[in-house]
Regions:
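Glycine-rich P-loop/Walker A and Walker A-like loops and their local beta1-loop-alpha1 context
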Residues: 2-68
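Conserved beta-strand segments of the P-loop GTPase G domain that flank and frequently precede/overlap
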Residues: 25-30, 53-56, 81-83, 125-127, ...
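Short acidic, S/G/P-rich loop/turn micro-motifs used as interaction or catalytic elements
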Residues: 31-34, 59-60, 130-139, 168-172
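Loop/turn-to-beta-strand initiation segments
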Residues: 50, 120-123, 155-165
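Nucleotide-state-sensitive switch-loop elements of NTP-binding domains
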Residues: 58, 67-96
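Short, aromatic/basic amphipathic alpha-helical patches
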Residues: 61-73, 174-182
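Phosphate-binding/switch loop-helix module in NTP-utilizing enzymes
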Residues: 86-151
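Phosphate-binding/switch region of NTP-binding enzymes
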Residues: 164-218
Length: 218
């Protein structure tokens, strides 16, 4: 039985079937450039969607430009919560303390609610969750943020969520254990392995009607 386009999200240039709404994707990889490329391909909102991005390492303006490179016009449909740079744009909220996950969660939920008033369909991304893990004393607080704010908004709304983790990052904890713990909360896991200067292999689990492994251009 086919699923209507209103029930799915297109994947742009990625060789993946449209993804059903409500899907949460844990995106991992140890090459930052490859991980970033795939993240924005999944997170850039299309014409009938809004985008909300938590950006831990780039300014809001840089994040908006990255979205627009993937889908022209998407920066005008997006809001960014940025821990780097300054918020001089109506589309950018500044995260003053990345370790204050209570405030981050409240702000994320508020921005998502505002976005859904403009357009019910949304894409929400966190880049990079590994940076958030490195800023907190107890990684379990990150799990609570994801479950209480990020994943719960996907379950309630008409959205697609992408949470990216740089597995090469030093977060002061066992990365393999962190990823294993987070995988239990996400519907889909995609691991990105760079295999050439402009090429990567995606190892996929949990995504119906898609191959277990696909090659993508970066």
């Amino acid at each position: 039985m086919s699923i209507s386009s209103e029930e799915t999200f297109a994947t742009g240039s990625l060789p993946l079937d449209p993804i059903q709404k409500g899907t949460s994707i844990l995106l991992t990889g140890e090459d930052a450039d490859a991980l970033e490329s795939v993240f924005y391909k999944l997170s850039a909102p299309q014409a009938d969607e809004r985008g909300v991005i938590v950006s831990t390492d780039e300014s809001g303006r840089s994040t908006l430009r990255s979205l627009d490179r993937v889908s022209r016009g998407s920066k005008s449909r997006s809001s960014v919560l940025a821990a780097a740079g300054s918020g001089r744009d109506d589309s950018v909220e500044t995260i003053s303390d990345l370790s204050d996950l209570t405030m981050l969660g409240m702000t994320l939920s508020s921005v998502l609610a505002e976005s859904q008033q403009l357009e019910p369909r949304f894409r929400c991304g966190i880049y990079l969750c590994s940076t958030i893990c490195s800023e907190v004393e107890d990684v379990r607080s990150v799990y609570r943020l994801l479950n209480s704010n990020f994943l719960s908004e996907l379950r309630r709304g008409d959205g697609l969520g992408v949470c990216a983790i740089d597995t090469s990052a030093d977060i002061g904890a066992n990365m393999q254990s962190i990823v294993a713990g987070m995988k239990t909360s996400f519907k889909v896991h995609i691991d990105v392995e760079k295999t050439g200067s402009r090429e990567a292999t995606l190892s996929i689990s949990g995504l119906a009607d898609s191959d277990d492994s696909v090659t993508v251009a970066l």
